[in-house]
Amino acid sequence: MENTPKLNVPKRKPTGEMRVVYFSSTTENTKKFCDKLGLPATRIPIKLSEEIEVDYDYVLICPTYAGGLDDFKGSVPRQVIKFLNKVQNREHCVGVVASGNTNFGETFGLAGHVLRAKLHVPLLHVFELIGTKYDEELVRERIHKLWNWEE
């Protein structure tokens, strides 16, 4: 059990500028949240035929796509899965923030929990829809702490 990574502890200290990579559907809720963070941000394309590759550390901000109640399938958007299937993109992810809708009950923010477990990175926060001023401040603070984390 000693080799099991701790889920909310960074695996390493991020390097370079604080950045976010995010996915936002055509509703642009996640984009609106990211715009308010005031950090350099890269958007994962909506079209599955388009690809991006990053060469810098980042926090992934991802909406949750799940049907609610007991429908836990498909919580991470396909575009995000495709982006993370590239080893370089996956290795540069140092943390996750998720959004969701509390109307969907137990699946609220589920993408964040799935990604945290798969990527072995901390889940920094889960916010609803476009978030609040409090969510923005908390995410900025936690990203800053992550970049300044000491082992």
Swiss-Prot record:
A Pfam family that the UniProt record links to this protein: Flavodoxin_NdrI
Biological process according to GO: protein modification process
Signal sequence segment: none
MF-aspect GO terms: FMN binding
InterPro entries on file: Flavoprotein-like_sf, RNR_Ib_NrdI_bac, RNR_NrdI
Family statement drawn from the similarity comment of this UniProt entry: Belongs to the NrdI family.
NCBIfam families per the UniProt record, alphabetical: nrdI
Function noted in UniProt: Probably involved in ribonucleotide reductase function.
Matching PANTHER family: PROTEIN NRDI
The protein's name in its UniProt record: Protein NrdI
Organism: Mycoplasmoides gallisepticum (strain R(low / passage 15 / clone 2))
Lineage of origin: Bacteria, Bacillati, Mycoplasmatota, Mycoplasmoidales, Mycoplasmoidaceae
Gene name of this polypeptide: nrdI
